[in-house]
Amino acid sequence: MKVSDRRKFEKANFDEFESALNNKNDLVHCPSITLFESIPTEVRSFYEDEKSGLIKVVKFRTGAMDRKRSFEKVVISVMVGKNVKKFLTFVEDEPDFQGGPIPSKYLIPKKINLMVYTLFQVHTLKFNRKDYDTLSLFYLNRGYYNELSFRVLERCHEIASARPNDSSTMRTFTDFVSGAPIVRSLQKSTIRKYGYNLAPYMFLLLHVDELSIFSAYQASLPGEKKVDTERLKRDLCPRKPIEIKYFSQICNDMMNKKDRLGDILHIILRACALNFGAGPRGGAGDEEDRSITNEEPIIPSVDEHGLKVCKLRSPNTPRRLRKTLDAVKALLVSSCACTARDLDIFDDNNGVAMWKWIKILYHEVAQETTLKDSYRITLVPSSDGISLLAFAGPQRNVYVDDTTRRIQLYTDYNKNGSSEPRLKTLDGLTSDYVFYFVTVLRQMQICALGNSYDAFNHDPWMDVVGFEDPNQVTNRDISRIVLYSYMFLNTAKGCLVEYATFRQYMRELPKNAPQKLNFREMRQGLIALGRHCVGSRFETDLYESATSELMANHSVQTGRNIYGVDSFSLTSVSGTTATLLQERASERWIQWLGLESDYHCSFSSTRNAEDVVAGEAASSNHHQKISRVTRKRPREPKSTNDILVAGQKLFGSSFEFRDLHQLRLCYEIYMADTPSVAVQAPPGYGKTELFHLPLIALASKGDVEYVSFLFVPYTVLLANCMIRLGRCGCLNVAPVRNFIEEGYDGVTDLYVGIYDDLASTNFTDRIAAWENIVECTFRTNNVKLGYLIVDEFHNFETEVYRQSQFGGITNLDFDAFEKAIFLSGTAPEAVADAALQRIGLTGLAKKSMDINELKRSEDLSRGLSSYPTRMFNLIKEKSEVPLGHVHKIRKKVESQPEEALKLLLALFESEPESKAIVVASTTNEVEELACSWRKYFRVVWIHGKLGAAEKVSRTKEFVTDGSMQVLIGTKLVTEGIDIKQLMMVIMLDNRLNIIELIQGVGRLRDGGLCYLLSRKNSWAARNRKGELPPIKEGCITEQVREFYGLESKKGKKGQHVGCCGSRTDLSADTVELIERMDRLAEKQATASMSIVALPSSFQESNSSDRYRKYCSSDEDSNTCIHGSANASTNASTNAITTASTNVRTNATTNASTNATTNASTNASTNATTNASTNATTNSSTNATTTASTNVRTSATTTASINVRTSATTTESTNSSTNATTTESTNSSTNATTTESTNSNTSATTTASINVRTSATTTESTNSSTSATTTASINVRTSATTTKSINSSTNATTTESTNSNTNATTTESTNSSTNATTTESTNSSTNATTTESTNSNTSAATTESTNSNTSATTTESTNASAKEDANKDGNAEDNRFHPVTDINKESYKRKGSQMVLLERKKLKAQFPNTSENMNVLQFLGFRSDEIKHLFLYGIDIYFCPEGVFTQYGLCKGCQKMFELCVCWAGQKVSYRRIAWEALAVERMLRNDEEYKEYLEDIEPYHGDPVGYLKYFSVKRREIYSQIQRNYAWYLAITRRRETISVLDSTRGKQGSQVFRMSGRQIKELYFKVWSNLRESKTEVLQYFLNWDEKKCQEEWEAKDDTVVVEALEKGGVFQRLRSMTSAGLQGPQYVKLQFSRHHRQLRSRYELSLGMHLRDQIALGVTPSKVPHWTAFLSMLIGLFYNKTFRQKLEYLLEQISEVWLLPHWLDLANVEVLAADDTRVPLYMLMVAVHKELDSDDVPDGRFDILLCRDSSREVGE
């Protein structure tokens, strides 16, 4: 650095010079403006390095991507060393506040600064402390302004789009040239975005008079007296402010379609949203700034951190925002962008950036342009308001053509030299921009330059008027006149814009920029804005409406007929009247803006006395702090009629209160001054209406707005409350979360939230700042906090596990609310008092308040929090036991879910449109019940582990969707939910306390049934400390009385209310429902129907285990049938035998049959029936008998006879029963035999035989057959007896026997077949018998059997399955519905056969899945090969997202549960084999090929079974390819070959590591780890890309979990996935490698550590600290994914090739290598040495050469 430059540095007092030059960045920030003014600068490009994050200068060798991302800076270059340069760039200091910045009470300064710079884009403006407090109000109330802007813009767009053919719309929204409409079709999200962009400007519009930056604003013309702006503010403050509420009214009118200004207002809002959308760097579509680099530039330059100036975009980029500017507009913008450098409010370096203060001052500027008493409305000028603005010289004036609405230039200068005056009309686009410049930009430019601007001197071409002596006119006066008279000015030079500059823009800028807003649109938009902002009386006041049209420079009739804006009755207004009315309108407009000075409002006399006194007091001492004095509006009177009107709005004209208590309490809440009220009313009483009606009454008050809050304990109740309270549109209801995040929106009447919201710090801060927000933001004190309502407040005391979450409620300012209301149905005095004290209140008053004692409080000055809460106990007052309208039954059952399923089935059979709630004790039980019952009902389930949004969605679905039948959940579903169709509540909880019982029963509003089911021989678990004890055995009513403190009525009438069988207090509908349920229960008992709901181990089952298991008696049997039902059929008899049984008995009989059989009877029967007996039976049955038997028993019976015969008998029988025999058998039952049989059996008898299982016959038969007789018959039936009976049985005897064997006899016989019986039957049927049986069961027989077996019969067969077959089955497979549709059975059974066939094929293809099979076995590898190729560490996370990871399906095969192909006893699932097969494919492919492979198998991403079939087709090819590609790997890992570095020619030539001894390699390895340990470097990141980032937690951790958390916190895994091939696996794959996947390798590594330690001690070397296992694994993983290192290692070490799986890499790294001195070192040490060698400055070039050599060597080899 030169000596002169160094002195300048010292003069600039750049104290941080030395430290800044030592910075690693090439770009150094410098805050000294003097330095940059005195030392020459240059423009250089810089970019941010992705690896290091440093800012570096663009050099010759910089890559193309870095050049593309570069940015330019004006810098000073400094040499800080040999060939080392640093570059200084100017960055100004933070604004300096007087006395230092004071943090806001509710926002930290950092948030304020971020909000100001981000939202308002005012980097160059300086604010004081008061300004920050004002601007912070927008942050606190952003939601209000966002919603307001969005609603207005949405409505405007709706109107404009809906009226395309309207005359006013056509004129307003149609292009003058093309005639095409310009109203774009915008999506709602786009409109919302535009509306949100407009919100900051609307806020500044309302608070512009409160910002200090406008203190420099002076609004006087030259020669007039200057006005004191402080006095102006004091004059404005006492006046009645125009409230923000007016804007809300605009929104409401638009929503109700009362407005007629929507189309006009749309234009101006669209102009704000589209034309002022230019944002800071990084916005959508930003391009590089284009500026003219002159000595004094017209367009000031702005760095990349500021806003872009004068965006010049190409019209050929459709993705850019529509902001293309043509030459004229660019000229207008640039001409007013230059401002003087001496203004305090702007930046000293760059002047002011145009787009910064356009956003701030768009709505705020109002200028006084003529005489003192004549006012001009800025932004709403009349057409002749611009007629005096000169274009270039005094003879070039600007006019507006009233017909075409185009700008006209009047001039007497022509290029031909003539002085003939001409009027030149501009085109529409140019007219738009000129008008925009005159009415908007020039006004803001004047405001920004201020009264001290004096750059212009007096020239002859200037007309100086209004001064007695022109020679005494100062430069300041001249400059003022020029600004108001001429268009194209260069304010920096103090002259007009040169013609060369104008031509330059014409050459550079596009000439075909698309038209945005034409003149008519802009003009009418400005007029519409003026109408809305001046006052609401424009809509109703006749004269002022007419004045608005005069201000637009057309008649009233024109405004009505052409524009369709207002409705008038006058056709004209005289000029004098129009002038007066315009003055009044202008005064209101200017007063509202608060920017003009020295005027006296003509209606100031209308102010009240309070305002005048306040104004005088403020003006007497203008140096004191100005406080806004607002007129305090009295609270509107309340009456009892308000509540009645509210009830009629909500419930209709027939509204009446439930009783007198409800009426009086509702009046107490609405009208009394009691600050805090607690109410205990029974569930279902209507507690919600106690505050709902007062809220509606408050919302109807027009003068005062009340904002109330309701809090409920659970998210489930939140959804229900919002639905109930928002009905009929009486209240605007919103979630509290909206208020916490965005503030009050000005519309909502009631916010609803949960207890967690009430306890949050953000909510507490919002309430604490309420008064300040309302006064400053809404400029009124008439928006008040209404009621704070807490429902079910007893939870504050009873919810022990949540009490720590309620601590934040004590910080809430309860005194800010008008009234606090606490409601509960289960809060006696003791519970209520403790709950209130827990949240910081005083508690209950000593004496609970009676409902009739409506006394006012004597002294409420202490506030709500210090005043005791008055308790209204409606339960004690009525002296009635609650919930008497509900029938409550308590049962002890064997299985709670089984009993609950029976009750629900019975309920929906009798009441199909009803709903039910089931309360479970655990979340696991909830999920199990939902999964099990989904086939019977439409189920919704909820528990606490679900997210808040999901809870709300599911609750809303159950409440609103009539098809949903059952809601299953934990106790959170029992509080506060109101469902009219609810008729049953079932509680499956052994720890139920009295509050939970009352809340659950209370859901039954209009009566119903409540069942409390508990298991037999169970005991209630111990309750936690502080919790209520579980309910006791005995009468429920008595326990409820005791809880509420009511008088006991033991021994009196009314002791049992809805319990213990009492039905006295129940409604008629409830009694009828009970009777129907009882009849269904009796019918089920008579039929002895058993419904198996869940296995006995249901309570202990784990809900997370969703695998489907399939069972059969013999795994190797080819007849393995899906499900326990078919399996049990195979266990006892073949399918055909079961079919014959089903033919003779109906569904009900079979069901009871299977339930009542005992084992010993069947066992003795089977034992006494030997082969000889059966043979005798078959031989002694003559043809006639056989025929008669065939008549009554189908061919199925014959099949059953074959089953019972021994092996020899069966073979002979089967051999003689061929196709011909079957035909002869059928023929022996000829017509004669049939007829004789029929003749012996009368019509009535036949009917009884055919319908032997009908109700009447069965009952009479049952009564005549006793159990004792049946038992004695079974006892006396020996082998001999059976033989004689069979031989003497003729046709007639058979008939009588059949007629005497009633349903009960069949049941007793069948009922004795249990598991033992089935086993004995199977034992007597040997292999030969089974084969012959199978051979005799033809396809035709099976079909006929299927047709004869109804759906119910099959289900009854399923129910009789032996217990052994069920023990491994899934509970869902054993469920059945007793009324299943018969027509669906054929489809189900066909589906079962298809699934059975598929399962058989898969089991045959993968026979070893019952063992620890892997895919390598399937491919045919030997065990020793599998040992080294084994895929440990490969799990489901190896698969990419979406591959074999579908949820809600079977985890074993990824199919629907009904189509699951898994089988019982399967240890290795098909999905596991599929992801192992995917890993095998990865073994054979590099990254690019594997990525393509994943795309090719996309059809199989959700079907692992299908993928296995696809994989199996090429198994031989895959096996050969693995053998070929991994032969070297197997040779090395099996120690058959040894790697020697001396055998690698390329390694010896290209790396010094290959010439090192083993000891040198080890020393280098330990040195690397020592350096890493000292610097606490992140291991995985270092070995991945040599990045030395610190991670102290990784080195201090002692377990894998902490290391993984540290790496995850640092984003290592995320970077690994984004930068390497790890992205081809699941997101958790690499992270899970640190778990127990590699425990075998870990043990080997730990053994090797001991060996290394012994070696070092033996060599006399100080033992080095070797890395622990986690760091070692991180190293290997980092090296595996380091592509550059892998390529070099594979190039240098010729004995190895590529491996693509991490497990193989880990095994390979542990093999031993012979170093140059023939000593053995692990390969991973050699790897680290090579990695270290690569870590040098010339790595990129070296890598490139290595790859070239590698490729060339391969070519030579080939």
Swiss-Prot record:
Keyword Ribonucleoprotein part of the UniProt annotation: no
Location of the Helicase C-terminal domain: 900-1051
Molecular functions (GO terms): ATP binding; ATP hydrolysis activity; helicase activity; nucleic acid binding
Disordered: annotated segments: 1142-1384
Signal peptide feature range: none
Amino-acid positions noted as binding ATP in the UniProt annotation, renumbered to this chain: A681, P682, P683, G684, Y685, G686, K687, T688
CDD domains recorded: SF2_C
Comp. bias regions, Basic and acidic residues: 1361-1384
Keyword field contains Hydrolase: yes
Documented EC number(s): 5.6.2.-
PROSITE patterns, sorted: HELICASE_ATP_BIND_1 (PS51192), HELICASE_CTER (PS51194)
Expression triggers: Induced in absence of telomerase TLC1.
Domain Helicase ATP-binding stretches: 668-845
Keyword vocabulary terms for this entry: ATP-binding, Helicase, Hydrolase, Isomerase, Nucleotide-binding, Repeat
Functional note: Catalyzes DNA unwinding and is involved in telomerase-independent telomere maintenance.
Similarity section: Belongs to the helicase family. Yeast subtelomeric Y' repeat subfamily.
Name used for this protein in its record: Y' element ATP-dependent helicase YIL177C
Organism: Saccharomyces cerevisiae (strain ATCC 204508 / S288c)
Source organism phylogeny: Eukaryota, Fungi, Dikarya, Ascomycota, Saccharomycotina
